[in-house]
Amino acid sequence: SKPTVSLVLGGSHSIGVPIAVSCKYSFIVPTGTMVIHPVRMNGMVIGVPQTFEYFKLIQDRITGFVCRHCQISRQKLEDLMMETGFLTKDVGSILVGEEAVNTGIIDEVGGIDRAIGKLREMIGDDQVQ
């Protein structure tokens, strides 16, 4: 219920994407990056269908959260996650500044001054209501 603004300054990796979009309005600096990738596994994994279903459930929850909090479609987000021609030895995509805005993940390119200005604007709007 409180006004919230996020600002991606450097690299927003892994859980940084859901954190960045969880705010009411989001910014990214022109050189900021967002790494979009599916849930990853480390260590020993039991190779049974239930393990796959569990990871799919986790991925669906994260994808649903991100899509509910920004303007990207589920299909576009999943396409970015499963891109194979961009990250070496991995799947996913790296979006830089304006690309994150153009895909609908982030609201606007801007720095700390724009983020603070937007927050002040949102606080002012709340006080009027």
Task: State the predicted function of each range.
Residues 1-17, 21-129:
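N-terminal organellar transit peptides
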